[in-house]
Amino acid sequence: NFATTHELAQNNLERKNQSVLTYLWADVYAAAFYAPTKASARQAVSTPLTQRLELYYFRNIDSQDVVKAAWVTLERQHDAATLQRLRPELDALHATFKDIQPGDRYAQNFAAGSGLTLEINGNVAYSSPNPALARAYLGIWLSPDGLSDELRTSLLAD
């Protein structure tokens, strides 16, 4: 269950879309994308506007498997120089990951001026003012060649 709205950095965000990521016929997590009321999901990503991506997990997942999947996707989406610049922050972000249990919620928030925050079960676990990090990490789900084109299409549908 995802809330229909979320308050972030003095912006009222509305849930634009939600979808489920399925891998080998098993539901892995549900995802919900939030953006400002007056913007479409695609506008929020392309501009970029304040946004939130929330994941609700159905399965146990080892944190190192999550990190590996993130790196595979980031390496597909970005050149080596970009990843080299972002690596210290990516490593710090990944260091906050915990082994995932069913019912866990991870949320990534982006707000202009405050950058990226990662929440784990409602608590801020990581924060960075770097908009390039926010763009790259949210891009794992919201940019082309990400984890799942089907999930991305569902989350960004108008």
Predicted regions located by residue number:
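Short strand-turn-strand beta-turns centered on an Asx-Gly dipeptide
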Residues: 120-122
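Cysteine/selenocysteine-centered motifs that mediate thiol-based redox chemistry or coordinate metal-sulfur cofactors
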Residues: 150-158
